[in-house]
Amino acid sequence: MSSSQTRFLLLYGSQRGQAKAIAEEIAVKASDHGFAAEVSCLSEEEKYNLERERSPVVIVVSTTGDGEPPDTAINFVKKIKTKTLCSVHFAHLHYALLGLGDSNYSNFCNCGKTIDKRLGELGAQQFYASGYADDGVGLELVVEPWIEGLWDALRKFVTSAMSTSQKDTNNHVGDHNAKNEMRTIESAVTDLNLHLLSLDESSSKDESGGSCNIVAEGEVLEASLTRSVSPLSESSLNVPALPAPFLDVELLNELQQDPTLLKPPETAHQVVITSAKQLTREDAVKTTLLLEMDISETPLVYEPGDSFDLLCPNNNSEVEELLLRLGILEKKHHIVKLQVKPDTKRKVSRLPLYIPEHSSLQYIFMWCLEIRAIPKKAFLRSLVEYTTNEHEKRRLQELCSKQGFADYNHFIRNPSLSILDLLCAFPSCMPTLSVILEHLPKLQPRSYSAASSIYSNPGRVHIVFNIVEFPPCPERPALRKGVCTGWLSNLVLPILQHSGGQMMLPEIQDASNVLPKVYICSRPSSAFHLPSDTAAPIIMVGPGTGISPFIGFLQHRKKQREEHPDVSFGETWLFFGCRHKDRDFIFRDELGRFQAEGTLTHLRVSFSRDQDDSTEEVKPKYVQDNLRLNAQDVVRVLFKENGYIYICGDAKNMAKNVHEELIDIFSRELQIDKLEAMKVIADLREKKRYLQDIWS
């Protein structure tokens, strides 16, 4: 650290690397503004001590699951929530916090808000207003202006602290000035966020989502991924600083063994897929598969409500297409040697830990890199330097600029474009391998809820999923399947049993030699489990594949009832929904059996596409409609009988709609206003009686 640079502590808590990447970006930019960031993960408690920290502290933290801290922040949150800490425990601490979340989830940025609130309760003071970035609309809309404002806030704080120290200013006056500065900063951030919001709203007024110019009478020129129109095409641009390169890449000799064999982490276990069944009819809108995996030879155990991370590769043809586009396909079997550039200007630079040594080029692109990741603006800024066509170079500059944020969202973020899509759209762009490796994030495992109970299926676990499809669009003309679901559907094709049909394995001595194998890791849930009190009633809301954990719940409850006939068991309500009764009513027969034997006491099903317009009878279309029709029972179960409600499925639409419907139900049935109803839900959450397993 230069003697002229002012130190601050930079902490991050990250689940999938976004908070870490943003913290590293802040650290890189710090030196340009006269600061030196000392970076640590929140889990690295041996590297920092907030009890003794006198420098400013900046915290970047994400939220995972149903408002839970990322794994790397769990101990930190638990530590600061210790009830024995006094109200001035952190009175010496001055901090700024940037929270990352997704507004598709009801507990938006909950980890960041929890840390923020608790630090305040312990006497810590903000020197800069907290920012909460929304991945649902684009993290950069808040992250970029928040980082820009951070440097002035740090300078003001350092100047104020030095002035206070030198003049021994009266504490009351100092507090008053600090509050005024805080209001000024909060006002500036609020104004900036409102400005961004107004820009975003105005840019979306055109139905196409982009701008358009009238070139001649009757002819309209519209913006596209590769073309801009006025005013953007004529604007001066504020583009991000060019990220400093930090990797040296060398291709060595060819790898002799199979270059695509996975080198699994220690926590992963290889398991055999013993069966695969299609649960939906061939004419269903989505294809749903159920897989059974044999975990009997592993130490893995689980409870209904837990999940499993499944390690999956990128599509091989997609990998080869990308390598071909980069001009290195013929070297796909060569070993890649990585080193940090000795002369890099990047302050925080290290080799990617997710790329093993002595890996082939093909292996790295198949198993290590998220090649489907939406390229961030910093990536686009780097691509500009490798683009020779002036028109293409200008367009990439626009897409990564402040002025082009609406076009970036509309043409890159919303259609979920990948680096391959961009390189196909901008043919004169020829980035080096090092640039690709520097910017592509780690390929993440995909998480699936257990759709079974280990007590009903010893040594086995079931998962259920839809085969995800991304339809063609102007920016990506070819249909694509989900990275994991597309791979799994091809992997199990030889053993797939279609709905209503039978699948016969070949007569062989050892079926495990021909059955497909995958690597999985256990991902226990902290709370999404059946109540320990079997007499407590439960309400389960799970349309589509959201029913998965509830099949495990019901299998588990059935086994409990069989083994403990004298024990009291509470009501079980299931609200399920799908499009068509005859096409995608998955687990229909099993639910019928659960009902017949009394394990499932109430089943309410809605079919969104089977509405009969010829009759006046209005049938429930979605799960929230059935909740409304059973409002009195919902209130009785939750409040008179202290029951639990579980919600599983799509966060963006279903979970939000169910949440809003419950607010209406509580308001109406309990005769309270909506604000009080929201507090009621918050109380249920706090007591772990309103639980969600949702995804976007």
Which residues make up each language-model segment?
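FNR-like FAD-binding dehydrogenase module
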Residues: 1-696
